[in-house]
Amino acid sequence: MEGFAMKIELTSDQALVLSDWLHRVMHKEDFSNVVDDRAVWSALLRISGNLETGLPQIFDSAYSEQLEAARTRLIAELGDFGQAIP
């Protein structure tokens, strides 16, 4: 489907947390083993690049605090989803 483009909308909290996560995991060997289709890297690199260039918070001196606040808000929205079952 050449010429078709998809738009994905994220909240600023989602974008910040996803950007941080991608930055931490994309270059780890374990993650490379999970991505078993080289073509998927095209989308991952596009998403990561767009997040990095579109998030001014990354360069803010209070980045760590903003990231932690975003994580806290998103986890609160999730409720019990994704929690380990005892």
What are these regions (language model features)?
Residues 1-12, 16-86:
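Positively charged, low-complexity terminal tracts
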